[in-house]
């Protein structure tokens, strides 16, 4: 690892326990900051309720650190939206937000659309499939943003649960997922070595300043986190990044074929930022004996949404007015 990356790791890595909520409340008040937690979700009815309840109880009702909690539903076919709303989240269907801009399917699309309805100066994003986690995920991600104005993006990292050698004993290891270790981390070490010390470069738990995210183009799918990391580094440098150890995280796992599509999206994002020609249409062909002919063509979302600040001058003014008028806590939504 290059010296610059090692020095960044030593200077910009903290633990969630370094950021007690009492300290954060003082800093939030002194900066007149507003904090939104946003959960992009699709078919997460089994987990979304518990996530929403914990954030509301610990960080809205008990402390007031978080001002609003939004679930952006991305074409769920289950009861994700109803469960989230019933447990106290403001719920929006991604396709219903600014419909004049059309709609894509994907996590990045939900995040891009969230910028039109969230009102926070600081945005914290969590995945909707978490099963082992805590509200310290939010406080940890907020901490560096409230304490250092140079920090623009905070990445969470954690130990993941893996099966033990006997196949049934769970153990925690400080590793990324399969796509992280086989795709994202090798890419960063080979082409962006200053970012080699980012432990979870494509993890779904991160905090960001609103002004930064509004200025970036957003891939509509799973290339989101890689693009935000690379573009933040490109525009603001390594010192604009920080990371926080969140402890242990457990979530629902995807099939290898689904991860293949994710890997293709991340590689496309990286190639674009290496100035390769963009793919107008991308397809991943995967072999599957269960289907006739053996091959399945999976579309790979490669579109990117433009920076929110570029789509409408009028939007920027409306958003500023909306944030100024917004109530401190919202308990209902669409």
Residue positions per predicted region:
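A conserved acidic beta->alpha catalytic loop
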Residues: 73-81
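Short aromatic/hydrophobic "clamp" motif used to bind/position activated sugar donors
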Residues: 123
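N-proximal low-complexity "stem/linker" segments adjacent to membrane-targeting elements
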Residues: 1-57
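The conserved acidic donor/metal-binding loop of glycosyltransferases
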Residues: 127-133
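Conserved donor nucleotide-binding strand/loop of the catalytic core
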Residues: 67, 81-109
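Acceptor/aglycone-binding surface of glycosyltransferases and processive sugar-polymer synthases
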Residues: 99-107, 111, 133-212
């Amino acid at each position: 690892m290059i010296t610059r990356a090692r020095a960044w790791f030593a200077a910009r890595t903290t633990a969630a326990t370094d950021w007690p909520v009492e300290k954060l409340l003082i800093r939030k008040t002194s900066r007149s900051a507003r904090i939104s937690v946003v959960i992009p979700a699709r078919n997460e009815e089994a987990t979304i309720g518990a996530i929403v309840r914990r954030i509301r109880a610990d960080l809205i009702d008990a402390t007031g650190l978080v001002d609003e909690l939004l679930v952006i539903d991305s074409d769920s076919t289950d009861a994700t939206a109803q469960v989230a709303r019933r447990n106290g989240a403001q719920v929006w269907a991604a396709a219903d937000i600014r419909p004049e801009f059309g709609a894509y399917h994907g996590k990045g699309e939900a995040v891009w659309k969230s910028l039109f309805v969230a009102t926070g100066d600081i945005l914290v994003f969590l995945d909707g499939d978490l099963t082992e986690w805590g509200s310290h995920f939010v406080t940890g991600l907020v901490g560096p943003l409230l304490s250092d104005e140079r920090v623009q993006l905070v990445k969470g990292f954690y130990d993941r649960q893996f099966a033990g050698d006997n196949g049934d004993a769970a153990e925690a290891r400080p590793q990324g997922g399969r796509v992280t270790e086989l795709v994202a981390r090798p890419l960063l070490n080979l082409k962006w070595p200053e970012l080699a010390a980012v432990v979870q470069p494509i993890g779904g738990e991160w905090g960001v300043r609103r002004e930064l995210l509004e200025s970036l183009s957003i891939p509509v799918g799973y290339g989101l986190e890689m693009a935000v990391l690379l573009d933040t580094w490109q525009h603001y440098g390594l010192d604009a990044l920080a990371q926080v150890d969140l402890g242990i995280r457990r979530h629902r796992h995807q099939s290898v074929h689904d991860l293949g599509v994710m890997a293709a999206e991340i590689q496309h994002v990286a190639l674009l930022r290496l100035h390769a020609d963009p793919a107008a249409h991308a397809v991943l062909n995967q072999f599957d004996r269960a289907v006739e002919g053996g091959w399945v063509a999976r579309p790979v979302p490669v579109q990117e949404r433009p920076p929110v600040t570029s789509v409408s001058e009028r939007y920027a003014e409306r958003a500023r007015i909306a944030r100024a008028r917004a109530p401190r806590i919202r308990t209902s939504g669409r």
